[in-house]
Amino acid sequence: MCHGRIAPKSTSVFAVASVGHGVFLPLVILCTLLGDGLASVCPLPPEPENGGYICHPRPCRDPLTAGSVIEYLCAEGYMLKGDYKYLTCKNGEWKPAMEISCRLNEDKDTHTSLGVPTLSIVASTASSVALILLLVVLFVLLQPKLKSFHHSRRDQGVSGDQVSIMVDGVQVALPSYEEAVYGSSGHCVPPADPRVQIVLSEGSGPSGRSVPREQQLPDQGACSSAGGEDEAPGQSGLCEAWGSRASETVMVHQATTSSWVAGSGNRQLAHKETADSENSDIQSLLSLTSEEYTDDIPLLKEA
């Protein structure tokens, strides 16, 4: 104001004021933004001994801004001291605020010591079961062969193979079935039924008397061939019994022949000589029979 008048403003001052006001406003805005940005960045989280951390989302961004989440992990054989293992960046700080550390896992050693015996028990049980199954399979496979071998041994014992036993340290050979029944010389053929021979001798004429005698001779010869010093007791008894039957048959023939000779005394001399030769053959057959049956021969002659 000059002498009651208002002086006009200088244009240069107005220009400086206008420029200063235009520059200050952006600076204020920039400072505000920088302050907010610096306040939202969190420092690096503490890393525990024998452990570490991972970021969510991965990978970890630098710097760790607000909203970043980290997860703590421990090395093998260690575990976190607390149950909570996640931290979140809020307003430049990690929330919740707590101390993170990894400690030695004592339960792991116990589990390891208990696992070794358990594994050995399981292995031994599995081996035992496998061995039992193998034995069962072998028994099933070998059972037919064992049965066939048993039958073959039994058949050999019946068919005549000698079986030996030990008696007071001495090996004694047992006789086979055939040797025990028939003797060591073989089979002894039984003679024909004497009753059939009696009927033939009674129904035949002078020319038919030689038939029963010829049938008796091979039988007696078969039994006599089995005799001797090496004859088995079983065969001796059988042959003696068959010889007694033959002697009885021959004696009946002799009695029949004697009665026939007495009834035909006036026949020709040739028939008489034939009867005498037949009687001599019968006497020779009787001499081959057993001594224990000789007492019955006179009774048959008297009859």
UniProtKB/Swiss-Prot annotation:
<feature type="region of interest" description="Disordered">
    <location>
        <begin position="263"/>
        <end position="282"/>
    </location>
</feature>
<comment type="function">
    <text>May play a role in growth-suppressive activity and cell death. May be involved in the production of chemokine molecules in umbilical vein endothelial cells (HUVECs) cultured in THP1 monocyte LPS-induced medium. Plays a role in preventing tumor onset.</text>
</comment>
<feature type="signal peptide">
    <location>
        <begin position="1"/>
        <end position="39"/>
    </location>
</feature>
<keyword id="KW-0812">Transmembrane</keyword>
<dbReference type="GO" id="GO:0006974">
    <property type="term" value="P:DNA damage response"/>
</dbReference>
<feature type="transmembrane region" description="Helical">
    <location>
        <begin position="121"/>
        <end position="141"/>
    </location>
</feature>
<dbReference type="Pfam" id="PF00084">
    <property type="entry name" value="Sushi"/>
</dbReference>
<feature type="region of interest" description="Disordered">
    <location>
        <begin position="199"/>
        <end position="237"/>
    </location>
</feature>
<protein>
    <recommendedName>
        <fullName>Sushi domain-containing protein 6</fullName>
    </recommendedName>
</protein>
<feature type="topological domain" description="Cytoplasmic">
    <location>
        <begin position="142"/>
        <end position="303"/>
    </location>
</feature>
<keyword id="KW-0768">Sushi</keyword>
<feature type="disulfide bond">
    <location>
        <begin position="74"/>
        <end position="102"/>
    </location>
</feature>
<dbReference type="InterPro" id="IPR042866">
    <property type="entry name" value="SUSD6"/>
</dbReference>
<keyword id="KW-0043">Tumor suppressor</keyword>
<dbReference type="InterPro" id="IPR000436">
    <property type="entry name" value="Sushi_SCR_CCP_dom"/>
</dbReference>
<keyword id="KW-0732">Signal</keyword>
<feature type="disulfide bond">
    <location>
        <begin position="42"/>
        <end position="89"/>
    </location>
</feature>
<dbReference type="InterPro" id="IPR035976">
    <property type="entry name" value="Sushi/SCR/CCP_sf"/>
</dbReference>
<feature type="topological domain" description="Extracellular">
    <location>
        <begin position="40"/>
        <end position="120"/>
    </location>
</feature>
<feature type="domain" description="Sushi">
    <location>
        <begin position="40"/>
        <end position="104"/>
    </location>
</feature>
<keyword id="KW-1133">Transmembrane helix</keyword>
<keyword id="KW-1015">Disulfide bond</keyword>
<dbReference type="GO" id="GO:0016020">
    <property type="term" value="C:membrane"/>
</dbReference>
<keyword id="KW-0472">Membrane</keyword>
